[in-house]
UniProtKB/Swiss-Prot annotation:
GO terms for molecular function: metal-dependent deubiquitinase activity; translation initiation factor activity; translation initiation factor binding. The keyword Glycoprotein does not apply. This is Eukaryotic translation initiation factor 3 subunit F-1. The keyword Lipid metabolism does not apply. It holds the Pfam family JAB. HAMAP family: eIF3f (MF_03005). The gene is eIF3f1.
Length: 280
């Protein structure tokens, strides 16, 4: 498959590890590089993990601890055998002269490696994210070269990652002086209340958009209209009494689960205290 047809999907844990490696870099290091781990399926490169590779860049050469990279990859394979080398990453907002040398190494480790750059300097006010593949150039029998060509890149996340990101966002609006060191998950009922409140605000936003379109205040968007039509068709047809009965049944089940989990927690705490109780 041609590398130009690839699309890169990056998970949040990758960005966190890149930023952590950048913050822990040596004082004389201008950028940090590392290995991207993930999988390739039907033209989609899904990057789910990564690790840093210590290196030094000189004017005419690059020194990288390749044995360290191999050891880290072997250790990761013992934990998750489904993650393979799919490319490499580097901090910064551009491709440097040394990038082609590093890319040659990863081209021996996997087919069509992708190169991901993460702008940790926040020059544009955001963490710029770009993905490239290397296209070989040259004429038969002559000198050959390569050119880094941008390919589409997007952020994606699993459901647990999305839940964790929502918890982290709760500390964004808090001042550093009052920002908590830990964030505990909300109780189930509190999550339902927050989700219902957010759903209500989104419905109000949709209704305002529809009213503005009808009043010719906003130019209609066909794509939005199709999505709204699909949304309406996805709503199950039921009466108000049926919905109330189903909702109450789900709430009762949720309350039962909460009660049982609290009983189990109390039982475990009591058992722990009895275990360490001194005997006469």
């Amino acid at each position: 498959m041609s590398g130009l047809n690839l699309t890169v999907r990056v998970h949040p844990v990758v960005l966190f590890q890149v930023v952590d490696a950048f913050e822990r870099r040596n004082a004389d290091s201008h950028r940090v590089i590392g290995t991207l781990l993930g999988s390739v399926d039907k033209g989609v490169v899904e990057v789910t993990n990564c690790f840093c590779v210590p290196h030094k860049e000189h004017d005419d050469q690059v020194e990288a601890e390749l044995s360290y990279a191999l050891d880290m990859y072997d250790l990761n394979r013992k934990v998750n055998a489904n993650e393979n080398v799919v490319g490499w990453w580097a901090t910064g907002n551009e491709v440097t002269n040394h990038s082609s040398v590093i890319h040659e190494y990863y081209a021996r480790e996997c087919n069509n490696p992708v190169h991901l750059t993460v702008d940790t300097s926040l020059q544009s006010g955001r963490m710029g994210l770009r993905a490239y593949i290397c296209i070989q150039l040259g004429v038969p029998g002559g000198k050959t070269g390569c050119m880094f060509t941008p390919i589409p890149v997007e952020l994606t996340s699993y459901e647990p990652e999305t839940f964790g990101l929502k918890l982290l966002q709760k500390t964004v609006t808090v001042s550093p002086a009052h920002r908590p060191k830990t964030v505990a998950p909300m109780l189930d009922l509190a999550q339902i209340s927050e989700a219902a409140t957010k759903l209500q605000s989104l419905l109000d936003l949709i209704l305002k958009y529809v009213d503005d379109v009808i009043a010719h205040k906003v130019t209609p968007d066909n794509a939005v209209g199709r999505q709204l039509l699909d949304l309406i068709h996805s709503v199950p047809h039921m009466t108000h009494e049926q919905f109330t009965q189903m909702f109450n049944a789900n709430v009762r089940d949720l309350l039962m689960v909460i009660t049982l989990s609290q009983l189990i927690k109390t039982q475990l705490q009591l058992n722990e205290k009895l275990t360490f109780l001194p005997t006469a």
